[in-house]
Swiss-Prot record:
Organism, scientific name: Desulfotalea psychrophila (strain LSv54 / DSM 12343)
This protein's UniProt keywords: ATP-binding, Chaperone, Nucleotide-binding, Phosphoprotein, Stress response
Gene induction: By stress conditions e.g. heat shock.
Listed SUPFAM superfamilies: Actin-like ATPase domain (SSF53067), Heat shock protein 70kD (HSP70), C-terminal subdomain (SSF100934), Heat shock protein 70kD (HSP70), peptide-binding domain (SSF100920)
Gene3D superfamilies xref list: 1.20.1270.10, 3.30.420.40, Actin, Chain A, domain 4 (3.90.640.10), Substrate Binding Domain Of DNAk, Chain A, domain 1 (2.60.34.10)
InterPro entries, alphabetized: ATPase_NBD (IPR043129), Chaperone_DnaK (IPR012725), Heat_shock_70_CS (IPR018181), HSP70_C_sf (IPR029048), HSP70_peptide-bd_sf (IPR029047), Hsp_70_fam (IPR013126)
Phosphothreonine PTM positions: 198
Protein purpose: Acts as a chaperone.
Gene name for this UniProt entry: dnaK
Protein name: Chaperone protein DnaK
GO MF entries: ATP binding; ATP-dependent protein folding chaperone; unfolded protein binding
Record HAMAP family: DnaK
Family, similarity comment: Belongs to the heat shock protein 70 family.
PANTHER family per the UniProt record, alphabetical: HEAT SHOCK PROTEIN 70KDA (PTHR19375)
Domain of life: Bacteria
Amino acid sequence: MGKIIGIDLGTTNSCVSVMEGGEPKVIANVEGNRTTPSVVAFADNDERLVGMIAKRQAVTNPERTVYAAKRLIGRKFTDAEVQRSQEVSPFDIVEGISGSVAIQVEGHKYRPAEISAMVLGKMKQTAEEYLGEEVTEAVVTVPAYFNDSQRQATKDAGKIAGLDVKRIINEPTAASLAYGLDKKVEEKIAVFDLGGGTFDVSVLEIGDGVFEVKSTNGDTFLGGEDFDMRIVHWLADEFKREQGIDLRSDKMALQRLKEEAEKAKMELSTTVETDINLPFITADASGPKHLNIKLSRSKFETLVEDLVERTVGPCKTALKDAGLSASQIDEVILVGGMSRMPMVQKKVVEIFGKEPHKGVNPDEVVAIGAAIQGGVLQGDVKDVLLLDVTPLSLGIETLGGVTTKLIEKNTTVPTKKSQVFSTAADNQPAVSIHVLQGEREMAEGNKTIGRFELADIPTAPRGVPQIEVTFDLDANGILNVSAKDMGTGKEQSIKITASSGLTDEEIDRMTKDAELHADEDKKRKELVEARNSADGLIHSTEKTLKDLGDKVDAETKENVEKEIANVKTALEGDDVEAIKAAIEALTAASHKLAELMYQQASQETPGDGDAGAAGAKKKDDDDVVDADYEEVK
């Protein structure tokens, strides 16, 4: 049985971990980094680039470089958050099938789940290269405040990437696993998770292997991306004021601003001022323009003050829902790159009245927790019980547009709840079940996550038919709903699918597409390796010919030069087999050169060397010179 890996699928960066010898290990990627940018780019030759290689070329290829796809996953195009992303994104965010979100690159529409699948595929590949075996199962983390649609879309992304997602686990819960695995003393902890795109806070009771989530809250559209954009807009406004040019209208300039903003933000966590220097950012009739400006930590804090303040409400709500005061929290665990910002840490102290615990790596702790959960599922990690909760209430729309909740928020999962409803009109032949998620009293204020119909209800006065609606919420936080006519026994059910609208057929198509590109990547790698081998062989063979000079007979030299020319011709094309065949032919032709080299080496070594030494000795005997030595005392 293969390993179950743990993947933190982040907005900005992703991380993969695995249990080895009872300990979680974060796996470094091919570049040697322990986190990988969640960036996907499409090159000119239809090549897909994922990770740091994609991020590096973003400035020259902004319209075909996709980042922060996690912020779009499981959403509808009309969502306010999607519209906000569309305004500042250098790549095209468009409407997809059934009102879903799509990312358009060169006429092709990609779903956010498809982009996320490419990132998951990269993490899968990183794990496989380290483990030396195929990986097919994973635990993938999501923000605790992700709704049903977003969770389902994340699971779909795993499937497209060729992974059976054994469990979707909340990021703060994963962090608590990593923090408290060996803790025997009971503690009440708060996990404050401010990442690249989302904010979560969870309150847990942990101790002796039991991790019980008491409450969770958050904001799925608050994170480092928003902090970056505040700097981007400030830089653009300052440049416009000085030069009269709005850099936001130039996608390449916008991408350069974004990269520099992210760098400045990170630097300001450890320094009080940073220089932002972007030469040749644009040009007009008078010539090239340069951007050179200083940004102080205090100015940055002024720009993002309201963003930091937005973390307060969810923290207070989470404490209230858990029935605890801030003073009853024993430890506050910081998770996510943005938690390094001094202003954020100061706000945490204000909220909880204590210094946060800094003993975990905020970039890796979630992936480590996911690997531990993988170990639990695999049976490698014993005596760990994880009791997570649903972040939002679930219910159905009833008469008058009211939301009737069947499962309240912060209910421990998995859970199953049933309630009996009836018809609203006489002789009503069918009932429409409108499934909702959210905390508002009226249906229109909550998120629709599914609709289905129970038909063929026998004619009867209103209020007489008995319709039992059952909500079954699994450990991943994914919902199944059924409705049953108690009179006839007729039943209708629905597995809630993401608002991304991915059907099984679409997932299969995307999976095949991902596999096809994996094969293409493999072939491309094989071609590169063959080219490198050919170049190396040409270089060494030409050097040998030159070194041997006249010692090579004309026939051998002509034969070798002919094969070198054949390899060079093969290198002009992309046929791997042709290059390999040419390499073999040149290697065979070079054997004669190797023999000559060996003969030459034989003539110059030990036997001749000894004779030379003897001769030298004789000469020494003929010309002996006595040296005068003075003894130094």
